[in-house]
Swiss-Prot record:
Family: Belongs to the RNase Y family.
Pfam family of the protein (one): KH_1
Protein name: Ribonuclease Y
Transmembrane segments annotated in the record for this chain: 2-22
Primary gene name: rny
Example GO BP: mRNA catabolic process
Keywords: Cell membrane, Endonuclease, Hydrolase, Membrane, Nuclease, RNA-binding, Transmembrane, Transmembrane helix
EC number of the protein: 3.1.-.-
Amino acid sequence: MWVEILVGSSAAIISGAAGYLLSKKIEKDKLKIYEEQARAKAKAIEHEAEKILQNAQVQVKEAELELKRDFEKKLEELKRDYEERFNELMEKEMSLKQMFKDELKHITLEKQEIKAEREEINRLKNEYEELKKRYQEKYQEVLEALQQQAGLTLEEAKNLILQKAEEESRLEIANIVRKYEEEAKREAKRRANYIIAQATTRFAGEFAAERLINTVSIPSEDIKGRIIGKEGRNIKTLEMLLGVDIIIDDTPNAIILSSFNLYRRAIATKVIELLVEDGRIQPSRIEEIYEKVKEEFDQQLLEEGENIVIDLGIGLIHPEIVKLIGRLKFRASYGQNALGHSLEVAHLAGIMAAEMGGDEVMAKRAGLLHDIGKALTHEYSGSHVDLGAEICKRYKEPDVVINAIYAHHGHEEPRSIEAAAVCAADTLSAARPGARREVLEAFLKRVQAIEEIALSKPGVKKAYAINAGREVRVIVNADLVNDNEAVLLAKEIAKDIETGVQYPGEIKVNVIRENRAIEYAR
């Protein structure tokens, strides 16, 4: 039994040893295979590296050759350019040398000519001195002989000759002057008649008479009561804001607005039309619509003025003056619309200036602006001439325009053809049959004078003459005029109107002082 165990153990040991040795041999064989594979890969890598290096060397050589070829090519081009430039400079140098030689030769010839001329001048000068000496000797001999024969001294003979020549010259000059004066007068009259005929036949103006009332149509009679408002609050607000007289009478479905100021009357008409259309007639709404309409009117005036300036082709004009041009539409003089009159004068003056050889565009510009001050006479005191000249000076209008403004009423003499043309055109436009009405203008001037007296007082914001000039409403600044001063102001204005304006009946002076306190609840 023990023998079997020993034999079995020995066999197991031998078997294990044989397996170990076999595994070692297998591992050794694998290691050898790996080493051979590694050597083969290393050799392949080395071969690839050598191949890459060879390719790189070839590329470097090709690049060197390319750079060398480019360098040689550029060098050749530079050399060729240099040679061309050098040849050009050489040619210029040769040309300049030749020019210098030619100029030097020319200067030498000129010097010779100058020398010869100087010698000739000296010779002639000597001859002149000799002749002068001989002439003086001869003159003295003749003079002495004449004095002996005439019994006069030299000075007496000179005076006698000069006196005779002066008398004859004066007579001849007087005849010539008289002749040309008569011809000039005839030609001037003929030319003036021709120019006026040309101007009047090439322009035909329209007559636009001024009215003092506007009628606003209303859908029903109950609107009249709403316009008046509770205790007359609405109509008082309207009249105070608009500066017109609102007449509500038995005329069916109509409200009459009366004012000599066309601008106020137009705004009032639009405001009442919008109020009637809106239906909300109350003081706050009245003020809101009034501000809106006034803003729209100002924009319309600017656009209308711009259109007129463009149509006349007179260049750029300051926007403030353009707005005043549009406002002339709502101003009249002796019943003649101021804007229509200014346009008429502009066209006539342009035609006349062109006929007389002046600047047609400048004459049109001066003609359009000659009465621009009339757009301001309702708001500021002073003549329309002074106001117009001041506004044009402020906005840098040309001197020709300012001179025309002063000259058309004789404040200055016209200093240019254009200013003279404006004066003549203004007279033509005003004198045209049917152009003006004197009675209406006298009334308008009286009403305007009443407003100007009120506006001239300190603290006065606005002044409106209403009721055909029988009442003036004066709105004062509550911060500058207190209640007691308002009473004194009314008396002072009334006294100035009595002394400064001629009027029938009596005029009511109504000074209004209103103080508002406004706050918002948020």
